A protein has these predicted regions:
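Helix-loop-helix hairpins and the membrane-proximal interhelical loops
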Residues: 2-46, 136-182, 200
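Cytosolic, long alpha-helical scaffolding segments
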Residues: 104-106, 206, 214, 232-238, ...
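Membrane-interfacial helix-loop connectors
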Residues: 59-60, 68-95, 100-109, 117-121, ...
Length: 388
């Protein structure tokens, strides 16, 4: 029984993650150039940056991916720390959309949605329609995965040992937060963790009083991806990743100390008896309240971050400024950044030609040295661009 349950849960979770990725890829392809324009233009205003973070995370389907992308922008000098923190706030809210979707039992419609997507994909040659069809296919697979995960976990409600374990250890705040952190660290997706909690709740083995602690840990665990990604970046890139961790840890602390009971009462009053919906709502409310509470203190938090990781002289930078792998999650922006590097390479080539001609005419050794340096830089540009 345990083997069957485990394999079924793994299969369901895999379908859930694949569907989420496919839907996100489709949304991103459809958004395309519009996504690039939104990020570039609207992040100049900090409040609008929050909305941009929500929108982009809804498209990408991952707050971790959004934060990693923002770390890349800051590292490449395309975004300031002040702009980035607003996007991070919004990403935390945007990532709750997936949990809201899967908390509704729409699995009976999933085959129809997949069929519609497949028909549209096969019958049209329009690339935009094909891209949009991926959204429907991913949406359907996501719900089939959720249904499979829930069905696989059904035997748990017949196991009193599991129920007793949940009641005994789940009520401990620190163990609950640790479980949530570990789950998200392993799954690398806060949405997947919420999906597992909703699947457990649908089988009646996870009360909301226990789930909220795991949700708090889930929000801390989602920061690990950006933290790891920031290790090879500039100081400002590291500051963005640390800011993400800081706001989620602060939110967890004051919710655990003062607002946990209120949060449970609110979500129970919104959807009495439906723990799956309560979990999704708790996840959303936590992140919205955290933005409302901490956003007014953004400047103070930035100063604190800069004390922990002070601004200073950076290590010797690569000749390329815009080629950051973290930005590859948004191909349209990554491609535009490559064009910037081509322009810089062309400028370097022009300088090389000018210095070479000057050296040939005047026999000036300084111009020869400059021309050789230009050649070295051109080779570095070529190598970096081709690799990217």
């Amino acid at each position: 029984m345990y083997t069957t349950m485990f394999l079924g849960a793994i299969a369901g979770l895999s379908l859930f993650l694949y569907g989420m990725q496919l839907m996100g890829d489709g949304l991103q392809k459809v958004a395309g150039e519009g996504l690039k324009g939104i990020i570039r233009k609207l992040t100049k205003n900090r409040f609008m940056s929050v909305l941009v973070g929500m929108f982009v995370t809804t498209i990408i389907q991952s707050s971790s991916a959004t934060t990693v992308m923002v770390v890349g922008f800051v590292n490449a000098g395309l975004m300031t720390l002040a702009q980035a923190v607003g996007v991070v706030f919004g990403a935390n809210v945007g990532t709750t959309i997936t949990g809201q979707m899967v908390s509704f039992n729409l699995s009976q419609w999933a085959p129809l949605v997949i069929a519609a997507g497949l028909v549209a994909n096969m019958l049209t040659k329009n690339p935009k329609v094909k891209e949009a069809s991926e959204i429907f296919i991913g949406f359907g697979i996501l719900f089939i995965g959720m249904s499979s995960l829930s069905s696989a976990l059904q035997p748990l409600k017949e196991l009193p040992e599991f129920t007793n374990w949940i009641l005994q250890y789940g009520s401990n705040p620190f163990i609950g937060v640790g479980i949530g952190l570990l789950m998200t660290l392993v799954l690398q997706s806060s949405s997947a963790t919420i999906g597992v909690l909703i699947a457990l709740a649908s089988q009646g083995v996870l009360p909301i009083t226990t789930a909220v602690f795991i949700i708090f840990g889930d929000n801390i665990g989602t920061c690990t991806t950006a933290l790891i990604s920031s290790l090879g970046t500039s100081r400002r890139g590291k500051q963005v990743a640390l800011f993400h961790l800081m706001i989620n840890v602060i939110g967890t602390i004051y919710f655990m100390l003062f607002l946990r009971g209120i949060l449970v009462n609110v979500v129970e009053s919104i959807d009495p008896g439906n723990v799956a919906r309560q979990i999704a709502n708790a996840h959303t409310i936590f992140n919205i309240v955290n933005v409302i509470v901490l956003f007014p203190f953004t400047n103070l938090l930035i100063k604190l971050i800069q004390i922990i990781i002070p601004d200073g002289e950076e290590e010797e930078e690569s000749i390329t400024r815009y080629l950051d792998k973290r930005i590859l999650v948004t191909p349209s922006i990554a491609l535009e950044n490559t064009m910037y590097e081509f322009a810089a390479m062309a400028q370097e080539t022009s300088s090389a030609l000018e210095n070479a001609i000057g050296a040939a005419r005047t026999r000036d050794k300084k111009l020869v040295k400059k021309a050789l340096e230009n050649e070295k830089n051109i080779n570095a540009y070529e190598k970096a661009i081709v690799k990217y």
